[in-house]
Regions:
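Fold-level recognition of mixed alpha/beta catalytic cores in primary-metabolism enzymes, strongest
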Residues: 95-98, 108-115, 121-176
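Short alpha-helical scaffold segments that flank and stabilize functional sites
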Residues: 10, 61, 116, 146-147
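Acidic/His- and Gly-rich active-site-bordering loop/insert found
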Residues: 1-103, 122-125
């Protein structure tokens, strides 16, 4: 059964990869491919022109129309020139918050989804869950178009897409 410990391990696992937009994301992609392969989930890789970066998508459940895409990106913004009190690619928990490059934007969304794959597989899904992880979102969504085209060509059309990208993550103000 999935629990918060497993999810925290997945968050730490993904944050540990330096996937700054200026470097390759292939080590992270290979790690996720390996995990999904162990779970008997087929993965599809869409590389950039020079083969240094890749999108990854995978279908969990039946290959039928409908279902939902869980969409995220693997790259993070640079840490250079920032005053980090801790190692940016190591998750630190302090005051019930997690700190590390990519925790908010946006490796946590992908980590939680990936941590739930065993439950998804045992749920006897009637419609698929599709993971779609792109590269270079931080510098113009460069990877997403080729992956979207591949998914449209190779998989049944989903009913919905959930994009785990945080928007305006400022603390919420109470409604009075």
């Amino acid at each position: 059964m999935n629990d918060i410990t497993n999810q925290l391990e997945w968050i730490s696992r993904l944050v540990a990869f330096d996937t700054t937009s200026s470097v390759s994301n292939l080590a992270l992609i290979e790690d996720i491919e390996s995990y999904l392969s162990e779970q008997k989930v087929e993965t599809f890789r869409v590389e950039n022109d020079d083969g240094t970066k890749a999108n990854l998508y995978a279908l969990v459940g039946p290959k039928v129309p409908g279902g939902v895409v869980l969409s995220g990106h693997t790259d993070v913004v640079p840490v250079a020139g920032q005053d980090w009190a801790t190692a940016p690619f190591t998750v630190i928990e302090k005051d019930d918050r997690l700190y590390g490059r990519g925790v908010a934007d946006m490796k946590t969304f992908s980590a939680i989804g990936l941590s739930l794959v065993p439950e998804m597989l045992s749920a006897n899904l009637k419609r698929p869950i599709i993971f779609a992880l792109s590269y270079d979102e931080e510098i113009g969504c460069l990877g997403a178009p080729s992956m979207i085209a591949e998914i449209a060509d190779k998989l049944p059309k989903p009913d919905a897409v959930i994009v785990g990208e945080p928007t305006n993550p400022a603390p919420r103000q109470p409604i009075s």
